[in-house]
């Protein structure tokens, strides 16, 4: 059995790490490189960096900090933000990233997933999915351009259908960003994770809602996700990664203990 992964998420805006609630009202957390170093030292399995306004601004992630991060950490990291071509991805990987993640650009051009997978291999290609639970229709809807409140919009994709589609096109991993839960720390949406796990045959990463060590345990035990991504509980030092992994190991979760 592959070890489960603990993945701190660093949302980047204007060169700094920020964090919002339900993808809104972002506050500055700190500088990128020191936070990356801290999480690597605490025992994170990998890091994910989202340049949250790159797609909505029509630009590619700033590659200068990608190179700085690569110099100071020795764990894998994934970068996302406005990657719209094989050339964009090539530059980011050349600067030191281990994976690239696409979200809004994949929705605009689904063939991008296949082109990237063909060039770099599926293991290198992550698709992020921003999913919103609509109570009226009792359905999960995919959203686009979520880094900018003014441009955020619902797409025509139901989350379940998009999960199936991106796998067919070559996604090697899926990060499910559950917008309703984002930043509120009341637990991952286990119902949604279980539904998507049933149709997802590549590694599935839960994102949005972690507030306690028990929430991580529930995601691994009850939804069988491959990794759990979180931000605010790590940024605000509510949960220490090393202590979290020790707890999960004691609960029988296969995990790399620091």
From Swiss-Prot:
InterPro entries in UniProt = Aldolase_TIM (IPR013785), His_biosynth (IPR006062), HisF (IPR004651), IGPS_HisA/HisF (IPR050064), RibuloseP-bd_barrel (IPR011060)
Residues annotated as catalytic: 11, 130
Keywords, alphabetical: Amino-acid biosynthesis, Cytoplasm, Histidine biosynthesis, Lyase
In Gene Ontology terms, what is a biological process of this protein? L-histidine biosynthetic process
Which EC number(s) does UniProt give? 4.3.2.10
Q: What does this protein do?
A: IGPS catalyzes the conversion of PRFAR and glutamine to IGP, AICAR and glutamate. The HisF subunit catalyzes the cyclization activity that produces IGP and AICAR from PRFAR using the ammonia provided by the HisH subunit.
> What does the record give as its pathway?
Amino-acid biosynthesis; L-histidine biosynthesis; L-histidine from 5-phospho-alpha-D-ribose 1-diphosphate: step 5/9
Give the catalysed reaction(s), semicolon-separated. 5-[(5-phospho-1-deoxy-D-ribulos-1-ylimino)methylamino]-1-(5-phospho-beta-D-ribosyl)imidazole-4-carboxamide + L-glutamine = D-erythro-1-(imidazol-4-yl)glycerol 3-phosphate + 5-amino-1-(5-phospho-beta-D-ribosyl)imidazole-4-carboxamide + L-glutamate + H(+)
Record-stated family: Belongs to the HisA/HisF family.
**Identification of the protein by name:** Imidazole glycerol phosphate synthase subunit HisF
Q: Where found?
A: Cytoplasm
Q: Which GO terms of the molecular function aspect are on file?
A: imidazoleglycerol-phosphate synthase activity; lyase activity
Check the UniProt entry and state the signal peptide residues, or none. none
Q: How does it assemble?
A: Heterodimer of HisH and HisF.
A GO cellular component annotated for this chain's UniProt record is: cytoplasm
């Amino acid at each position: 059995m592959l070890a489960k992964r603990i993945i701190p998420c660093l949302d980047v805006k204007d060169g700094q790490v920020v964090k919002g609630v339900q993808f809104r009202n972002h506050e500055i957390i700190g500088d990128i490189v020191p936070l990356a170093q801290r999480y690597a030292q605490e025992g994170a399995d990998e890091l994910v960096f989202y340049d949250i306004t790159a797609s909505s601004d029509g630009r590619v992630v700033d590659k200068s900090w990608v190179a700085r991060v690569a110099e100071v950490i020795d764990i894998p990291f994934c970068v996302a933000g406005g990657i719209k071509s094989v050339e964009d991805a090539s530059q980011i990987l050349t600067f030191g990233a281990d994976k690239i993640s696409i979200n809004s650009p994949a929705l605009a051009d689904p063939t991008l997933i296949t082109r990237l997978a063909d060039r770099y291999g599926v293991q290198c290609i992550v698709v992020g999915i921003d999913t919103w639970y609509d109570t009226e229709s009792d359905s999960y809807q995919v959203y686009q351009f979520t880094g900018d409140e003014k441009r955020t919009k619902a797409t025509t994709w139901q989350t379940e259908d998009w999960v199936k589609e991106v796998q067919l096109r070559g996604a090697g991993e899926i990060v499910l960003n559950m917008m309703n839960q984002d930043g509120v720390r009341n637990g991952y949406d286990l119902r949604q994770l279980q539904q998507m796990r049933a149709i997802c045959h590549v590694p599935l990463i839960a994102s949005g809602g972690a507030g306690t060590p028990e929430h991580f345990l529930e995601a691994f035990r009850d939804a069988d996700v491959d990794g759990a991504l979180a931000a605010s509980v790590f940024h605000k030092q509510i949960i220490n990664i090393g202590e979290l992994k020790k707890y999960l190991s004691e609960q029988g979760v296969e995990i790399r203990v620091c």
